[in-house]
Design a protein with these regions (language model features):
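Polybasic low-complexity intrinsically disordered regions
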Residues: 1-75, 80-88
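Hydrophobic side chains within alpha-helical segments
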Residues: 55, 119-122, 157
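Helix-centered, glycine/charged polyanion-binding patches within enzymatic domains
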Residues: 75-140
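Membrane-interface transmembrane-helix boundary segments in multi-pass integral membrane proteins
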Residues: 137-149
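Amphipathic, Lys/Arg-enriched alpha-helical patches that create a basic surface
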Residues: 151-155
Length: 183
């Protein structure tokens, strides 16, 4: 643990991210649909040291992961065994390892959409449920808080669908509920 850090969650772990360098904390793994609006289908909370591909493989083996026709994943999901397992379950797992070398290809265009879609889903979830700062510590407590936020997002999405309201108007409902509680 680096010296000088305050208020550290001692249950959390350090791991090296290809995107952010060394990070301390936990990991939320999301699978989502993009159309007609971003919504989580699957969520798993785990220590930061647990690999995403491990979680995906375990969820597939236990039939906990909804298999979609197409799953766009980053390079951590690109192992041949995992790609084959996902295909065996009826889906296509597209990762950088499956992309052709030529820059102009429909597979590359399709894969480029991954960054926009997953980042949008995480951003909407963080904003809607105010997840910038978690008020709890520990794997179980933070996991409960974060997974309850994912569940709330899913429930409000479904309610919007059934009520013929705009699907992505989730933050507005949560903000209105907060306002009513405060009043």
């Amino acid at each position: 643990m680096p010296a000088g850090l305050r208020n550290v969650d001692t249950e959390s772990a350090w791991s090296k991210s290809g995107y952010r360098g060394w990070v301390q904390g936990y990991r939320l793994i999301l699978q989502g649909l993009v159309f007609p609006a971003p919504v989580p289908l699957f969520a798993r909370w785990c220590p930061n040291t647990v690999g995403e591909s491990t979680v995906l493989a375990e969820a597939l083996a236990a039939d906990h992961l909804p298999v979609t026709e197409l799953l766009l994943g980053d390079s951590t999901f690109g192992g041949a065994d995992l790609v084959a397992t996902y295909a065996h379950h009826g889906g296509w797992l597209l990762t950088p390892q499956q992309l052709p070398a030529t820059p102009n290809s429909w597979k590359r265009d399709l894969y480029a959409y991954r960054r926009e879609t997953i980042e949008l889903l995480f951003q909407r979830l963080i904003q809607a449920c105010d997840l910038k700062i978690c008020p709890t510590k520990g794997l179980a407590r933070t996991g409960t808080f974060v997974l309850a936020s994912v569940w709330l997002y899913q429930v409000l999405f479904l309610d919007n669908y059934r009520s013929h309201r705009p699907l992505a108007h989730i933050k507005e409902f949560i903000d209105e509920a907060r306002w009513r509680i405060a009043a």
